[in-house]
Amino acid sequence: AATSAKEMLRQTFDVELTKTRTWLQERRVTFNGDAKLTQLYNTNLFFCMFFSTGITLDTEELVLVTSRSPRYYVSAAYWDRDSLLWSFPAILDADPERAKEMLSYVFGRQRRNFGIHSRYIDGTVLEPGFELDELVAPLLALERYINKTDDKSILSDTDIVQCISLI
């Protein structure tokens, strides 16, 4: 964090602000003629992008979380439903590459406990109990990804093939 802060200072505030605004604008979704819907959608989109995913400090691995907000009672826990049925669709609209990374995490790190109510970010059980929506959420997200991107090559990924047969 300290090194990143020093680099941002070197780049100057104006440069960093311009880069940030450009990044946000490239991912912004517009609904023609409906400013209120555009604002609401993008508020939700960027909340999903910034509060439902994170990069671990130790391995720099993308992880999905129910929320990174400290106001949420299970902050930094993982639920398939929240990550894949609520956050994933918006992120897929704005950043298909990030969405593909999300699927890689889900079908990799989280696969051993598909269907379990909630888990830690390493895939171990947090709160036990089977829930059908938690079980099928990875498949629904995968289908949505393929329909949106037409990237059928993802179906040859070994982790995904194994998970589909497991489910």
Protein language model regions, located:
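Acidic/polar, glycine-enriched structural segments that form the non-catalytic walls/loops
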Residues: A1-A77, S153
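Aromatic-rich carbohydrate-recognition surfaces in CAZymes
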Residues: M8-L9, F13-E16, Y73-I167
